[in-house]
Amino acid sequence: MSTQAAGNQTSSGATDSEDSYDSWYIDEPQGGQELQPEGLVPSCQPNVPPSLYHTCLAVLSILVLFLLAMLVRRRQLWPRCGHGRPGLPSPVDFLTGDRPRTVPAAVFMVLFSSLCLLLPTEDPLPFLSLASPPGRDGEAETSRGPWKILALLYYPALYYPLAACATVRHGAAHLLGSLLSWAHLGVQVWQRAECPESPKIYKYYSLLASLPLLLGLGFLSLWYPVQLVRSFGHGAATGSKGLQSSYSEEYLRTLLCQKKLKSSSHTCKRGFASQAWMYFRHSVYIPQRGFRLPLKLVLSVTLTGTAIYQVALLLLVGVVPTIQKVRAGITTDVSYLLAGFGIVLSEDRQEVVELVKHHLWALEVCYISALVLSCLLTFLMLVHSLVTHRTNLRALHRGGALDIGPLTQSPRPSRQAIFCWMSFTAYQTAFTCLGLLVQQILFFLGTLTLAFLVFMPMLHGRNLLLLHYLKSSWPFWLTLALAVTLQNAAAHWAFLDTHHGRPGLTNRRALYAATFLLFPVNVLVGTMVAAWRVLLSALYNAVHLGRMDLSLLPLRAATLDPGYHTYCNFLRMEASQSHPAATAFCALLLRTQRPKPRATPQDGLRLGEEEEGIQLLQTKDLVAKGAGPRARQGRARWGLAYTLLHNPALQAFRKTALPGARPNGAQP
């Protein structure tokens, strides 16, 4: 009996111990479920897998590209054996000045935003099933490297037909562009609406980063239907209308009909407001009549703005939410953590918590302030660089040369110039991203130093490290300040004298003695000046890192700056291959070959006027109106002929003498 009772007691004790043992893990999930940490966004499982979306879009893009190829006839690659066969359409006419620029800008913005969305995604190519799921040890992550490299080629090919629909200039192409843009926009909107949150980086990062992508696709989904309606309404009249109002003719009209500046404008005194306005006009790009930025520069501006948004968004959502979570989770245990490092902020633990939260808030303010300052400076540098682009292009159009040292000044295209022209827009985007990141680091360190070494100690009256350092080293700084002040005062009052209105040296013995005696002190001053020089150089280079029109190296070493070297070759390529004067001349030649219409509107051009170039001199100038038609013809002839013959930038368009040529262009 006693043994059974003891056994029952033992079994009951074991049961109690097991119950108490299980109670230790009462917070563990039951049934093998995993407990999600607080604040972690679960992965979204869409109803339709993204692989199906991308497969359909890829097939649709290939079909659209095939249909566009049927509309384009191949004439350049094999003119003898392949004439009239379908050819691959061009996505963007980069060297054509009269094509719409909004479509390439929107497509490039969509492409760059899609590449930025590759950062948080797990599947770079969603329509391909990866070999192995991601593991905890990161082995599967390394296997995704080749797929990410392949994604850099997949997305340009995916959006290739979307851009090519605008270059074909056909109603069917506009219809295909409308369908393709609607498909892309519908897929993106459906995905963002079904899964607005993502567990990577920040829960709304994918949604915020896709805003430029949605904006570009939304514009394309409206632009293509509008062009389709216009093609049905106007027909082929739109092409001739665009040809008559071409940029090249406007450029020549502005160039050959410049009004003389009034002499009073140079002698009148400008006030402060007018001087400020002139400085604003020279610092900020304002569109001017008769000049249009090349398409490559327009794309660079669009991608720079998109890069500023994407990098700023990544820097913001990658750091600020983490700081806010840390500040919200501060408890009294932080006092023990700081005491372990020998830091005692206060005897009251609650006061320590408030101080730590206040310092974390100051850290967040410094970070956001540095980010705002970096974005503003990058944007201002972008706007100011457009003025430099316009000045350099106008100089090259007039036949000038850029002073960049030993680089060749030949206007003809070369292998290096073509490579630089191809990579200019991509380089500009990369320089902007890296420049914004470097500025953020430098400005954050600067604001952090000012906040925690100057403002916060003075506000709380404790941890005055900077003031203690200045208190202990004031003789050193006072000596340097007195040395600089006394040398400047002596140079002005003792060693400089004016004779007959001309300054000259005096008291040379005292000057030599002071120079010898103050040499050790000047070494210390030079050390401080060298540190200040390094700081200024770092700030200047960080601010101007995103600008390719400026060299970060001296003029003699400008060829070693790859960004500036690429920019100069890009300008030469643009000036030699898309010169407005040569384009206008070719347009006039093509126009004279057309049959003369029966009825010419008032704004139209007669055949004789086209041959003589009189339409380039249609101006409201009274002097030009008072002159006879022969005088206008002479000015047009000499102006255009002199530009075509004596402008070095147009040498690339010249051909050798034709054998057996006859006057007036007749061929035997």
From Swiss-Prot:
Tissue specificity remark: Expressed in placenta, spleen, retinal blood vessels, and in astrocyte perivascular endfeet. Not detected in the endothelial cells of the choriocapillaris (at protein level).
Region Interaction with RBP1, as annotated, extends over 236-294
Q: Where is this region: Disordered?
A: 1-28
Pfam families, per database record? RBP_receptor (PF14752)
Q: Does the keyword Cell cycle apply?
A: no
- Outline which residue ranges sit on the Extracellular face: 1-51, 123-145, 191-206, 318-368, 445-474
- Keyword annotations: Cell membrane, Glycoprotein, Membrane, Phosphoprotein, Receptor, Retinol-binding, Transmembrane, Transmembrane helix, Transport, Vitamin A
- Residue positions where Phosphotyrosine is found in the record: 642
Attached carbohydrates are found at: 8
Membrane-crossing segments per the record: 52-72, 102-122, 146-166, 170-190, 207-227, 297-317, 369-389, 424-444, 475-495
Q: Which GO terms describe its molecular function?
A: retinal binding; retinol binding; retinol transmembrane transporter activity; signaling receptor activity
Q: How is it modified after translation?
A: Phosphorylated on tyrosine residues in response to RBP4 binding. Phosphorylation requires the presence of LRAT, suggesting it may be triggered by the uptake of retinol that is then metabolized within the cell to retinoids that function as signaling molecules.
> Per the record, what about its domains?
Contrary to predictions, contains nine transmembrane helices, with an extracellular N-terminus and a cytoplasmic C-terminus. Besides, contains one long helix that dips into the membrane and then runs more or less parallel to the membrane surface.
What is the protein name stated in its UniProt record? Receptor for retinol uptake STRA6
Q: Which organism is it from?
A: Bos taurus (Bovine)
